């Protein structure tokens, strides 16, 4: 043999083994320094097989190296270190480098103050106190950090990257999953191509979501904390943002996006949950909260323009501080409210509540139910009010209350089933009551006031001329300034 190794019989293994030249057998007085390294020699029927030991050695500081080009520090700085593999290099005390071109370099302060590093795998690099790099082409730089997987990369202290091409670029980062990336301080990234911190591609940049094409300048300049992305291709950026679910995206400070997306690859995830406004919240499949303090909850819910609320399926709140709740409810006016199914609210400070209700006038109120294939509840005049099934208030300050009632002139008021007030400032009170003249008033079932400034009071009472008056059941005033008082009374002027 040579000056470094010798062959002895191992009673425990029941075979010949290669050990250090200074090793002793069981009966020796000195302790064996290195036991059973490299290989055993097995006896064969036709004779024995020879074994050629690779280059290697043990230093006076108990540092072990094995392999062509393997190196350790022979001084006290390299005590108890191990380098195994071609061109492997274990640079500091208690560091371990195993694999071709692997490098392990811990932190050495003094003979009694040091922390090793561990690098296992071809072309791995572990640099820093207590660092661990496992895989092929894995790189870990930063004290107490861990990188596991092919081409995993850790850049700063106290971080973890686990998975093929995973990245942990700042301190306190946890990235787990193939191509997962944590680019902000304290970021959490869990899932395939999940990204926390530094929006390096956005909606139209790097649509393939590949770490190899991430914008390095953006990563390095990102200085915000606490983003968390969990799920397939989830993205959280902006500082304290949270994205949970497939393709969920929280892209502003303190934004929250929870929900799934579609698509089989990174380029066709067009339907995804997104919270892009500061302190915005989007929850549900394809829900979107676009501006500051927006809240969107439900499948395809959409809130935009700031402080907007959209809750339900396919609901929209596109006006500032607007509220839309229900099913296919749409609110586009500022500070407006829409609650119910198939709601349309397009004016400022308007309110629409019910089924098939439209409030399109500023400050208008529509409450009730439309009919399938029939009329909707419509409050289209400014400050108009429509309450009841199929009611209509389409003029400024018009009021329609009661099923099928209509207030269709400025200041007109219709109260009662199928009542109509079509004259300016006219009033119709009662079922089927009608006031069609300007300033006309009809009170009673089927009462009718068609003359300007006319008044009809009583069931079927009728005042048909200007300033006429009919009071009583079926009373009729037909002439200008005429008066009919009493049941069945008539007056022609």
Residue ranges and their predicted role:
Residues 4, 9-13, 17-24, 32-41, ...:
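Glycine- and small/polar-enriched repetitive beta-structure motifs of secreted/surface proteins
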């Amino acid at each position: 043999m040579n000056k470094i190794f010798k062959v002895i019989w191992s009673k425990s293994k029941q075979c010949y083994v290669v050990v250090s030249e200074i090793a002793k057998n069981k009966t020796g007085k000195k302790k064996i320094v290195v036991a059973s390294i490299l290989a055993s020699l097995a006896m064969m029927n036709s004779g024995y097989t020879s074994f050629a030991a690779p280059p290697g050695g043990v230093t006076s500081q108990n540092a072990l190296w094995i392999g062509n080009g393997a190196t350790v520090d022979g001084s006290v700085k390299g005590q108890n270190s191990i380098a195994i593999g071609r061109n492997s290099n274990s640079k500091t005390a208690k560091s371990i480098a195993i694999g071709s071109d692997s490098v392990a370099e811990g932190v050495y302060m003094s003979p009694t103050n040091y922390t090793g590093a561990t690098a296992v795998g071809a072309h791995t690099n572990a640099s820093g106190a207590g660092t661990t790099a496992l895989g092929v082409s894995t790189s870990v730089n930063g004290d107490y950090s861990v990188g596991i997987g092919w081409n995993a990369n850790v850049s700063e202290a106290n971080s973890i990257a686990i998975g093929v091409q995973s990245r942990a670029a700042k301190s306190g980062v946890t990235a787990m999953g193939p191509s997962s990336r944590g680019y902000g301080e304290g970021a959490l990234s869990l899932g395939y191509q999940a990204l926390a911190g530094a929006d390096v591609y956005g909606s139209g940049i790097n649509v393939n979501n590949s770490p190899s094409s991430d914008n390095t300048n953006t990563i390095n300049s990102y200085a915000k904390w606490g983003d968390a992305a969990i799920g397939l291709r989830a993205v959280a950026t902006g500082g304290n943002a949270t994205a949970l679910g497939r393709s969920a995206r929280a892209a502003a400070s303190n934004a929250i996006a929870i929900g799934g997306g579609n698509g089989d690859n990174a380029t066709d995830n067009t339907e995804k949950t997104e919270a892009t406004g500061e302190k915005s919240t989007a929850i549900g499949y394809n829900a979107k909260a676009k501006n500051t303090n927006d809240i969107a909850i439900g499948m395809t819910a959409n809130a935009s323009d700031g402080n907007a609320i959209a809750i339900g399926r396919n609901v929209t709140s596109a006006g500032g501080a607007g509220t839309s709740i229900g099913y296919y409810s749409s609110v586009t006016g500022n500070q407006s409210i829409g609650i119910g199914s198939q709601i349309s609210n397009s004016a400022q400070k308007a309110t629409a509540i019910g089924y098939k209700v439209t409030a399109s006038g500023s400050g208008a109120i529509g409450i009730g139910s439309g009919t399938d294939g029939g009329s909707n509840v419509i409050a289209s005049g400014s400050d108009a009010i429509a309450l009841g099934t199929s009611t209509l208030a389409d003029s400024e300050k018009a009021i329609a209350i009661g099923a099928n009632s209509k207030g269709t002139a400025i200041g007109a008021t219709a109260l009662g089933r199928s009542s109509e007030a079509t004259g300016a400032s006219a009033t119709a009170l009662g079922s089927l009551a009608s006031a069609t003249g300007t300033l006309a008033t009809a009170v009673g079932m089927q009462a009718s006031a068609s003359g300007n400034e006319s008044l009809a009071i009583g069931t079927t009472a009728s005042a048909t001329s200007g300033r006429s008056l009919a009071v009583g059941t079926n009373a009729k005033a037909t002439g200008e300034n005429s008066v009919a008082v009493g049941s069945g009374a008539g007056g022609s002027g």
